[in-house]
Structures are given as structure tokens and as C-alpha cells.
Amino acid sequence: MKIQSMFQKDINRDINGVIKVSQDDQQSLKQELSEYIITKELRRHFATFFDNYVKAIDNPTDKIGVWISGFFGSGKSHFLKMLSYLLSNKEVDGKHAFDYFADKFDDPMMYATVQKCVRIPTESILFNIDIEGPINKDKTAVLRVFAKVFYNHCGFYGEDLKVAKLERFIDKQGKT
């Protein structure tokens, strides 16, 4: 018996060593979702996130935010990408993100919490701030990047915030 025959999946398949936000083809997403492993530490982070998220669902607030930090290569982008897929319950290969995670949450309470969260219609906007951001960085650079990406997501011209705001105003007037 060869060691490689002991594995459920082909060990010679392509495995992407670096998770990229922009890599969103169905095959890559399916592999990421199906092969994502929730370690003890990740379980704790998912629990913290979703416990607080469900509190904001039960008691709406504008005082919610998330800060994800860690060393290079520690899995921040991968974790964030999985959160994004779960929150939007993205459909990949005919299966929703939550369904890929159904057997990954071994705690029934956490499973129920995540399930409650994914039932709320949510849009997530994933982007790499280094790619979207301006070369000249000043005090408002991060804010401008967020606004640009948001307006682009809404279908407006986010490259020029004045134009995007005008488009949004016209859209709200129902004149588009």
C-alpha cells in the first residue's frame, strides 16, 4: 500500500498556496470551501465573530466592526474570504457556502448561530486595498478606496466619487 492511496483526495492536485481575493472562478472557490479546515483556533475566531454578528442582528447597531490582524501567511485573507462566502452564502457549484461548512462546525450552538446569520440576506465586497488604492496615500486614502469599491459594487462609476454620488442621487430619484 502506498501512502498516497490513504488520502481521500489526489495529493498531486493543484493546491493554491496563496489565497487571493480576486481568484473567484468556480473550481478554485469549490476547492477553497470544501478543503477549508477549521482548527481549534479558527473555531474560536468564528465563534467570536458570529456571536457578535448575531447580537447585531438581534439588536441592530451601527457600532460594529471587525479588525483581523496577524503575521504574513497566518491565514487572515483565507479566514476573511471564508467569512465573506458564509455571510453572503455564496453559491458555488450548485451548493451554498453554508452547506460546505455544515460538517465543519461540530458545536451545535455555533452551527445554529452561523445558520441564523447566513439566513439574513447579506452582500459582501471583497477587495485588495493595495490594488484598489491610490499611489499617493494621505489621511483619506483608505476612505476613498472603500467608497470607490462600494460605488463600483453598486454599479456606479467609483473611479470618480463626484460622478458616483451624482449617479446615486439620480438613481434615488428613479431617473435611471
Q: What do these predicted ranges mean?
A:
Residues V66-F71, L80-T176:
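P-loop NTPase motor core
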Residues N16-Q27, H45-N59, T113-E123:
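Active-site-adjacent bridging/hinge elements
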Residues M1-I38, D130, Y157, L161, ...:
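N-terminal accessory segments
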Residues K76:
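Conserved lysine of the Walker
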Residues Q31-N59, A102-F105:
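N-terminal pre-Walker A segment at the start of P-loop NTPase domains
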Residues I3-G17, E41-A47, F98-V114:
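Phosphate-binding glycine-rich loops and adjacent basic patches that engage nucleotide phosphates
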Residues K63:
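Short coil/loop residues immediately preceding or within conserved phosphate-binding loops
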